[in-house]
C-alpha cells in the first residue's frame, strides 16, 4: 500500500499547516487549468485540504501506533473516507469519532477500516501495483476527468471516491478498477455531480 508514503507526506503538510503556510500549499495546487475540469470548486478543495491536515494531526496525536500509521484519509467535498487496517473495533470506532469532531463542516464519514490481519510486504506490493495501474487507466481514458476521483487500495480491495459528471463516467471508472489483475473487490463511494449529497 501507499500508506507509509502518504502518511510521511501528510506529516510534512501538517508541519506546514502548523507553521501557518497552508495557504501557500493551496495556492500551488489550485491552478486555473485544474479549475476548468474539476467538479469541486476551488473553495471546497481548499476546505478539504485543511480538513485532511487537521484530521491527520488528530489521528497522530490520538495514537500514532494504533491509528495514524495504518489509516489512509481521503476527503472530497467534506466527505471523509477512511481506509486501512486497525487492531480492534474500539480503534475503528475512535477513528470515526475523531473524524466527526474535526469540524462541523463534515458531511459524512465513510469508515472502510478493517480489523486485524496485518498486511505483508507482498500484499503491500500488490496494492501499489494495482494503485498505479488504476491511475494509469484513468489518466489514459479521454472520457474520464481523472482529477475528480481518488482511490486507495488495501489488501487488493480498491476503494473509490469522487464526483462523476454522469452515469457513464461513473461506470467507466468502476469498470477500469474491476479489470485490473489481482483485484479482489471494488467498493465505490463515487457520487454524481447532481447528487443531493453535494448540497
Question: Where in the sequence are the language-model features?
Answer:
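N-terminal targeting leaders
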Residues: 2, 6, 17-199
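Classic N-terminal secretory signal peptides
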Residues: 11-14
